[in-house]
Amino acid sequence: MRHRTMRPKTLWWIGCWAFWVGTAWSGPQREEHLADAVRITMSSAVADLPPPTPYLPTSSDDQAYQQWLAHTQAQLAKKLQDKRGQWRLPELATPDLQQAFLQTVWYESHRAGLEPALVLGVIEVESGFRKFAVSSAGALGVMQVMPFWTRQLAHGDASVLFQWQANMRFGCVILRHYLALEQGGLHMALGRYNGSRGQLAYPQAVLAAKRRWQP
């Protein structure tokens, strides 16, 4: 289905971001007709963004989460530093920012029934963790969400996709939707997410990254 034309103001604003932050690897997610029940379910899933505070009912759950957070933050910090020890991305240049980012990953992935390692793999391949990434196809943010999703599921303001939590909320809900369409087939669902269904390069890259993020 052909994408609708975005408003000139939105295109100008996104173009400015593209100039400053460069492009990311993302094919065009296909805009599709959603059955009313699916659209309502997905719209409900992306609505209401409470603080991404983990629900940890037992002390063992809390301990497992703290171990995951410490281990993953150490991995992330190592990945984000260059050979001189300088931070590559200002939006993730402090331990507090890294922790907030990972807390959001944990919350949004579990909320959608996805593994945090899978979501981190998608983020690494799609945007290289760049909060303001813009692909040549027009996908935005860390999970490279196409702007038409904000129109189909929410208020139509694509600028929210440059916010960590909103971007991950959309990205995780969309990936869960594609998994349902593909009856749990992860390779095909990832292909749909990237706009390259049936091709191997993208799913293999994400799954390789996923393995690196597993505890």
Annotated model-derived regions:
Residues V125-F129, S196-Q199:
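A short structural micro-motif
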Residues S136-A139, L161-F162, G195:
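A glycine-rich, coil/turn loop motif that links secondary-structure elements
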Residues S136-H155, G171:
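Substrate-binding/active-site groove segments that recognize
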Residues V142, P147-R151, L181-P215:
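Catalytic and substrate-binding regions of cell-wall glycan-acting enzymes that process beta-1,4-linked
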Residues S135-S136, P203:
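Outer-membrane beta-barrel translocator domains and adjoining extracellular loop/strand segments
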